[in-house]
Swiss-Prot record:
Biological function: Viral suppressor of RNA silencing which binds specifically to silencing RNAs (siRNAs). Acts as a molecular caliper to specifically select siRNAs based on the length of the duplex region of the RNA.
Family the UniProt entry places it in: Belongs to the tombusvirus protein p19 family.
Pfam families from the UniProt entry: Tombus_P19
Keywords, ordered alphabetically: Host-virus interaction, Inhibition of host innate immune response by virus, RNA-binding, Suppressor of RNA silencing, Viral immunoevasion
Gene Ontology biological process terms in this record: symbiont-mediated suppression of host innate immune response
GO molecular function: RNA binding
GO CC, any one term: virion component
Region (Disordered): 1-34, 145-172
Stated name of the protein: RNA silencing suppressor p19
Biased composition (Basic and acidic residues): 1-14, 150-172
Signal peptide feature range: none
Length: 172
C-alpha cells in the first residue's frame, strides 16, 4: 500500500519521515517498491571497518503534488544495470496518472526531489508546467546518477589485479 503524507509543511515532513512505502500502487508515481536499508544494514555500511562507506547504498527521491508526497529509497550501486533500473523507477505516464488524482482546476505546486551522495536537488513548478517539470526531472536524475568518467576509471583502478602484492614484495 502506498503511503502519502499530507500536512502543512510538505518539505519538513519529507525530511523527517522514514523513506518507506509499498510497491507502486494505482496512485503512486513510482513503479518500484521502497528499498530502504534496515537500521542494522545502515550501521554496518557506515561503520569504521566498512570499505564501502563512501559509496551510498542508494538514493532518495520524491514526487509531491500539493500537500501529498510520495517517497522512495532505491538501491543503486553505479553499475549499468542498476542505472537502467533506477532510471525506470517512474515514467512520464505514472507521474501524470498520480498527478491527475490531485490536480483540479486550481493551480497547485508540483515538486520532484532527488538526494544522492549528500547532494539534494529539488525541482518545483505549478501544475500547468508539470510536463516540463517531468522532462527536467528525467534529465536531472540521469545526470546525478550517471557515473563520471573519473568515477568509472576509479572503479576499474580500485580493483587490484591478482599477483600485484607478490610483485610489490619481490621488488622491495
Amino acid at each position: 500500500m502506498e503511503r502519502a503524507i499530507q500536512g502543512s509543511d510538505v518539505r519538513e515532513q519529507a525530511d523527517s519521515e522514514c523513506w518507506d512505502g509499498g510497491g507502486g500502487g494505482t496512485t503512486s508515481p513510482f513503479k518500484l517498491p521502497d528499498e530502504s536499508p534496515s537500521l542494522h544494514e545502515w550501521r554496518l555500511h557506515h561503520s569504521e571497518e566498512s570499505e564501502n562507506k563512501d559509496n551510498p547504498l542508494g538514493f532518495k527521491e520524491s514526487w509531491s503534488f500539493g500537500k501529498v508526497v510520495f517517497k522512495r529509497y532505491l538501491r543503486y550501486d553505479g553499475a549499468e544495470t542498476s542505472l537502467h533500473r533506477a532510471l525506470g523507477s517512474w515514467e512520464r505516464d505514472s507521474v501524470n496518472d498520480a498527478a491527475s488524482r490531485f490536480l483540479g482546476l486550481s493551480q497547485i505546486g508540483c515538486t520532484y526531489s532527488i538526494r544522492f551522495r549528500g547532494t539534494r536537488l529539488t525541482l518545483s513548478g505549478g501544475s500547468g508546467t508539470l510536463q516540463r517539470l517531468i522532462e527536467m526531472a528525467i534529465r536531472t536524475k540521469r545526470t546525478m546518477l550517471q557515473p563520471t568518467p573519473s568515477e568509472r576509471e576509479g572503479n576499474v583502478s580500485r580493483r587490484r589485479p591478482e599477483g600485484t602484492e607478490a610483485f610489490k614484495e619481490e621488488s622491495e
